[in-house]
Amino acid sequence: MLRIAVPNKGMLSEPAWNMLAEAGYRLRTNPRQLVVQDPDNGIELFYLRPLDIAVYVGRGAIDVGITGQDLLKNSGTAALEHMPLGFGASTFRFAAPNESPITTLEDVQGKRVATTFDKLVHDYLVEHGIQAETIHLDGAVESSVQLGVADLIADVVSTGTTLRNAGLRVFAEPLMHSEACLIRSPRLNEQDPRLAVLTRRLQGVLTAHQYVLMDYDIPISKVAAAVAVTPGFESPTISPLHDKQWNAVRVMVPKAKVNQLMDDLYEVGARGIIVTALQASRM
């Protein structure tokens, strides 16, 4: 069976579970379960600490896992990113107290930086020629400045609310942009059919989240103009109607552009425009 690691807690956990459920996989029913076998789908799910997933995958103990790109980079393991998953977007930023004179990357020189991602931060500073002390903390790094342990912090920022509440402000360019991703062991062949099935299923969920099905009627004389507005993946499905002067069109369109596309189609001459949500797909 394909061994898959998923976060047992944290901001990536629930979206990861939901995505796997939408892809047809069985999840745990008891929060104390650490392992779930799904023989019908040929997988075994392991619920692990988010920080540890890349380590297990990199060492080949687990075949694939869902984690953050920042966690993968910080792990320094041999695990390979296989595909982005479209959730858990964040940036990794430096932050200093509001009243601090630290406002640029150069100001970090000689300072103390508290972070949970010490390898990521150390490598970034070395790359930019900055010498600073990195202090590893397992969490709540915002308190380190107030307690006098550090001069600034480096941490994941989603909304910035936690930093603002702690009297901190971000500065300099982000160290990196991150989102959830599927990673694989270097021991797992990229062409492994089990991985191919998982990839198709997850991509199908992503497509269902990002696209909708649009149906509309259009005069035959306006079909070309309408298709130019909604070209679809390969090509729209065009069917004749009882009224020989009209065709029915069915096409997939980006969910984020639905209202603009409906307006554009109406201007072209389309009528009876209907949008339907997708549950799953294989493209």
Swiss-Prot record:
Keywords: Amino-acid biosynthesis, ATP-binding, Cytoplasm, Glycosyltransferase, Histidine biosynthesis, Magnesium, Metal-binding, Nucleotide-binding, Transferase
Gene3D superfamilies for the chain: 3.30.70.120, Periplasmic binding protein-like II
Biological process per Gene Ontology, one example term: L-histidine biosynthetic process
Disulfides per UniProt: none
GO MF, any single term: ATP phosphoribosyltransferase activity
Annotated signal sequence range: none
HAMAP family: HisG_Long
Name listed for the protein in its UniProt record: ATP phosphoribosyltransferase
